[in-house]
């Protein structure tokens, strides 16, 4: 693999990275930073990579730079044709996994997994608001949801920030242009126009956090795929959260490679559509409770629970 391909692969996997972090990942030593400078600048000049800030600068993928294999888009089609391997999960097994996950969330009326319900409902009910007090309230909802879902632990830069760091991201999410992504159906999610919106909002979320002042302890504002997708799941319900369990399961089950990009998202949407009667019946059943569950939330529950069970055995 060439140096440029390694850089693109690392940025696709980790979000924003410094030159030193890239060098360490490629060569095992930050001191090799100068060795990748030429390749990095070539990618920047070709507008495949974006440089943000300084001392140290952060690098992230530009729109459309991350591809999973070869996309097969016909000129007269508005859908992405997702290349799926032999899928090793039946709709019956998927329903069982989703039910198991759901039943575990309702045991405790104040359980942490209900933070998704509260967050998604708040954003759903306040769509396109411009009220500053409401935006502040939504940022607080987002912060607590992310904390409940493990995004404020370890080396996360969010650990050193207050909830208001999310306000610029909330403003982006509330823009009218992203209305098609709210609770999007699996069929609509396979359309090129909506996948382009998803790519765009993902990149804008990365840039927003990258533009924030680094924490006082020097922690880089590294917006990972996990963080971006958890934000999108909790606010728009348009994509599963690409955390360790989800990625592990979709790879093992032959759904997709687990990389966060258009083909991977289209693949899980296609899996839903292939079993749409079964999944829609279950979705309507679950939606009789506090919130209407979007299709991608069901897929998140399914594959997370699958890997969670495997991890315990």
Regions from the language model: what does each represent?
Residues 40, 232, 236:
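DNA major-groove recognition helix of helix-turn-helix
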Residues 9-12, 27, 233:
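Short, locally clustered residues in the helix-turn-helix/winged-helix DNA-binding domain
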Residues 15, 29, 239:
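Flexible coil/turn residues that form the inter-helical turn or adjacent wing/linker of helix-turn-helix
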Residues 71-219, 237-313:
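An N-terminal alpha-helical hairpin/helix-loop-helix interaction module that forms a charged
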Residues 17-26:
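Short acidic, hydrophobic short linear motifs in intrinsically disordered regions
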Residues 213-233:
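Helix-hairpin-helix
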Residues 2, 31-70:
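Charged low-complexity interaction tracts in eukaryotic proteins
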Residues 1-14:
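Positively charged, polyanion-binding regions of nucleic-acid-associated proteins
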């Amino acid at each position: 693999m060439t140096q440029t391909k390694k850089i693109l692969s690392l940025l696709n996997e980790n979000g924003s990275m410094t030159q030193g972090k890239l060098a360490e990942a490629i060569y095992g030593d930050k001191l090799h930073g100068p060795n990748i400078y030429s390749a990095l600048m070539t990618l920047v000049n070709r507008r495949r990579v974006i440089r943000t800030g300084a001392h140290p600068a952060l690098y992230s993928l530009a729109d459309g730079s991350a591809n999973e294999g070869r996309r097969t888009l016909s000129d007269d089609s508005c859908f992405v044709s997702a290349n799926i391997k032999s899928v090793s999960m039946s709709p019956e097994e998927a329903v069982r996994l989703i039910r198991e996950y759901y039943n575990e969330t309702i045991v405790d009326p104040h359980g942490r997994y209900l933070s998704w319900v509260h967050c998604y409902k708040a954003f759903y009910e306040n769509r396109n608001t411009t009220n500053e007090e409401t935006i502040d309230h939504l940022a607080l909802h987002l912060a607590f949801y992310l904390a409940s879902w493990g995004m404020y632990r370890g080396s996360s830069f969010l650990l050193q920030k207050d909830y208001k760091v999310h306000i610029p991201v909330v403003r982006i999410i509330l823009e009218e242009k992203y209305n098609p992504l709210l609770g999007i159906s699996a069929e609509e999610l396979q359309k090129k126009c909506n996948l382009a919106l998803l790519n765009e909002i993902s990149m804008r979320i990365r840039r927003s956090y990258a533009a924030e002042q680094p924490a006082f302890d020097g922690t880089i504002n590294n917006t990972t795929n996990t963080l971006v997708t958890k934000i999108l799941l909790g606010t728009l319900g348009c994509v599963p959260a690409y955390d360790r369990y989800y990625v592990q399961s979709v790879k093992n089950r032959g759904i997709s490679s687990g990389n966060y990009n258009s083909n991977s998202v289209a693949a899980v949407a296609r899996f839903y559509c292939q079993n749409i009667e079964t999944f829609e019946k279950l979705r309507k059943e679950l939606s009789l409770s506090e919130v209407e569950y979007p299709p991608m939330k069901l897929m998140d529950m399914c594959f997370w629970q699958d890997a969670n069970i495997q991890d315990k055995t």
